[in-house]
Swiss-Prot record:
One of its GO terms (cellular component) is protein-containing complex. One of its GO terms (molecular function) is RNA binding. The lineage of its organism: Eukaryota, Metazoa, Ecdysozoa, Arthropoda, Hexapoda. Interacts with DENR. SMART domains: PUA (SM00359). Disruption phenotype: RNAi-mediated knockdown results in pupal lethality. The abdominal epidermis is soft and transparent whereas the head and thorax appear normal. Belongs to the MCTS1 family. This is Malignant T-cell-amplified sequence 1 homolog. It is found in: Cytoplasm. Its main location: cytoplasm. The gene is MCTS1. Residues 93-172 form the PUA domain. GO terms for biological process: formation of translation preinitiation complex; regulation of translation; translation reinitiation.
């Protein structure tokens, strides 16, 4: 999704959000990520003014007061954390671990296939379909990518074929390389 993202070319407009919209977004984030409650004031302070950067391909970036990209979404999908945020606060998103053989493919933006989640070295945390997940790697401490489960973990174990996680944002893509938006 962010493979060819460049902040100068890809961002079409930036809007300041009204306080009622800010409260709604905070409530949605806390509903989607209950473990985030103790850190939400560090990430998105109540008195801070948030902005939304509208990008090409129906992507929206949620910016905090400093201009850091903290969450993004595609169309009306769920808000997903950026990898920079996940590296600071790693435990509020469900984690799925891929084996060593899948690392280079995930780092090039490929979707995670079911065999990469069920082989020895991989580890799955039980989760439902359409759950936002952090994609971890065997032997690494930080997340490689952020994605959305296309099947529940039980279906992945039973089927073991096809795409298990659709990758949205990965290390060294355009969003990772972009600087804070002023």
């Amino acid at each position: 999704m962010f493979k060819k993202f460049e902040e100068k070319d890809s961002i079409s407009s930036i809007q300041q959000l009204k306080s009622s919209v800010q409260k709604g977004i905070r409530a949605k984030l806390l509903e989607a990520y209950p473990k985030l409650e103790s850190h939400i004031d560090l990430i998105l302070p109540k008195k801070d003014s948030y902005r939304i950067a509208k990008c090409h391909d129906h992507i929206e970036l949620l910016l905090n007061g400093a201009g850091d990209q903290v969450f993004f979404r595609h169309r009306d999908g769920p808000w997903m954390p950026t990898l920079r945020l996940l590296h600071k606060f790693p435990y509020f998103v469900t984690m799925q671990q891929v084996d060593k053989g899948a690392i280079r493919f995930v780092l090039s933006g490929a979707n995670v296939m079911c065999p990469g989640l069920t082989s020895p070295g991989a580890c799955m945390t039980p989760a439902d379909k359409d759950t936002v997940v952090a994609i971890m790697a065997e032997g690494k401490e930080h997340a490689l990518a952020v994605g959305l489960l296309t099947l529940s973990t039980q279906e992945i174990l039973a089927k073991n074929k096809g795409i298990g996680i659709e990758t949205y944002h990965f290390l060294n893509d355009g969003l990772w390389k972009s600087k804070p938006v002023k």
